[in-house]
A protein has these predicted regions:
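N-terminal helical capping/dimerization or prosegment-like subdomains
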Residues: 2-85, 90-94
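Charged, low-complexity, helix/coiled-coil-prone segments
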Residues: 1, 69-73, 104-108, 112
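Active-site metal-coordination/substrate-binding segment of hydrolases
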Residues: 81-139
Length: 139
C-alpha cells in the first residue's frame, strides 16, 4: 500500500469523528466582537481558540494559547517543521440560511452546512487530522 493509500484509508476510518470535530468548532459563534481584557477579538473568538486547544488535547497534541491571539501545536518537536495556518474566527452569521442556522451545523446529502464549514474551521480540522495521520502512521 502506498503512503497516499494509507493516509486515505486512515482518514476514511476517522471520517465520522472528523465531522463531529468540525461541528464542535462550528457551534461556536466566533465572529469578531468587541475586545475584552485577555480576549483581543472578543468572547466568541477566545471560545473558539479554547475549543481548538481541546481538540489538540483530545487527539494527543500539546497546544499553546498565545494570549488568545492564536493557538499552535507541533507533531514531533523537531527544529525544522512545516507550518499549517488556519483561522477559527468567522464572519457574522447573517440572514438567509435555508438548511440550518449559522451555528447549528448539519450534514445533509453528504454536505455540511454551518458558518465556517469551508472557511476555515473545516480546513483547520482537516489539517489537524492530516497531522494526526502522519503521527499515527509513523511518517
Amino acid at each position: 500500500m502506498t503512503v497516499q493509500e494509507k493516509i486515505h484509508e486512515y482518514l476514511s476510518v476517522h471520517r465520522d469523528e472528523m465531522v463531529e470535530d468540525i461541528k464542535t468548532l462550528i457551534k461556536v459563534d466566533s465572529a469578531r466582537a468587541e475586545a475584552l481584557p485577555g480576549k483581543p477579538y472578543g468572547e466568541g473568538a477566545a471560545e473558539a481558540l479554547l475549543a481548538g486547544l481541546s481538540l489538540f488535547e483530545k487527539h494527543g497534541f500539546l497546544g499553546k494559547n498565545w494570549d488568545n491571539y492564536a493557538i499552535d501545536t507541533v507533531i514531533n518537536g523537531k527544529e525544522l517543521g512545516l507550518d499549517i495556518l488556519a483561522h477559527l474566527d468567522v464572519v457574522p452569521g447573517g440572514d438567509g440560511w435555508t438548511k440550518t442556522t449559522p451555528f447549528e451545523p448539519i450534514v445533509e446529502d453528504g454536505k455540511m452546512y454551518g458558518r465556517g464549514t469551508s472557511d476555515d474551521k473545516g480546513p483547520a480540522v482537516a489539517a489537524l487530522y492530516a497531522m494526526k495521520a502522519v503521527r499515527d502512521l509513523g511518517f
